[in-house]
């Protein structure tokens, strides 16, 4: 603390002057879009959100074509459904690295962050759903003297 305290009464006045929680403001670029990056495993997604008809494009393809499995499509739409904003935003994403599952998670993370930048009021809903938290689980590295990260080579007693 910068100030020196001489008595307990002064401590009470200093504690009351603490700043309030930060107010989140809308962050848009020159075209009126919200931009965010999402990450999952080795995948990194760059996501732009703007008002529109609900069209989602991933790497210049419709998301139904890029993510053919219904589970991955559902993962992608979770933040939009949770915030009741289906059909209100056009989403453009470019994603690279990792496999399809990691890429779907990265796009979901990016969509969630971009929605909060566009509409800060959605932050509580998306935070409660766990969409704003970066899933930090990555593949454990292989160790020498082992077949994989934890799997040992076959042991022969004799």
From Swiss-Prot:
Superkingdom as given in the UniProt entry: Bacteria
SUPFAM superfamilies xref list: Ribosomal protein S5 domain 2-like (SSF54211)
Gene Ontology BP annotations: translation
One Gene Ontology CC term in the entry: cytosolic small ribosomal subunit
Record keywords: Ribonucleoprotein, Ribosomal protein
A molecular function GO annotation: RNA binding
InterPro entries assigned: Ribosomal_Su5_D2-typ_SF (IPR020568), Ribosomal_uS9 (IPR000754), Ribosomal_uS9_bac/plastid (IPR023035), Ribosomal_uS9_CS (IPR020574), Ribsml_uS5_D2-typ_fold_subgr (IPR014721)
Matches recorded under Pfam families: Ribosomal_S9
Family to which this protein belongs: Belongs to the universal ribosomal protein uS9 family.
PANTHER family in the cross-refs: RIBOSOMAL PROTEIN S9 (PTHR21569), SMALL RIBOSOMAL SUBUNIT PROTEIN US9M (PTHR21569:SF1)
Protein name listed in UniProt: Small ribosomal subunit protein uS9
Organism: Brucella anthropi (strain ATCC 49188 / DSM 6882 / CCUG 24695 / JCM 21032 / LMG 3331 / NBRC 15819 / NCTC 12168 / Alc 37) (Ochrobactrum anthropi)
Gene coding for it: rpsI
């Amino acid at each position: 603390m910068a100030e020196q305290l001489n008595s307990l009464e002064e401590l009470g006045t200093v504690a009351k002057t603490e700043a309030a929680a930060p107010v989140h403001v809308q962050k848009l670029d020159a075209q009126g879009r919200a931009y965010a990056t999402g990450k999952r495993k080795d995948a990194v997604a760059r996501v732009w959100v703007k008002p529109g008809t609900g069209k989602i494009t991933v790497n210049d393809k419709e998301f139904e074509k890029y993510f053919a499995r219904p589970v991955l499509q559902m993962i992608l739409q979770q933040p939009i459904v949770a915030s009741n904003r289906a059909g209100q935003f056009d989403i453009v994403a470019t994603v690279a690295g990792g496999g399809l599952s990691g890429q779907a998670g990265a796009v979901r993370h990016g969509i969630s962050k971009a929605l909060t930048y566009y509409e800060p009021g959605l932050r509580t809903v998306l935070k409660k759903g766990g969409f704003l938290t970066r899933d930090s689980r990555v593949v454990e590295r292989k160790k020498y003297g082992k077949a994989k990260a934890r799997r040992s080579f076959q042991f022969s007693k004799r």
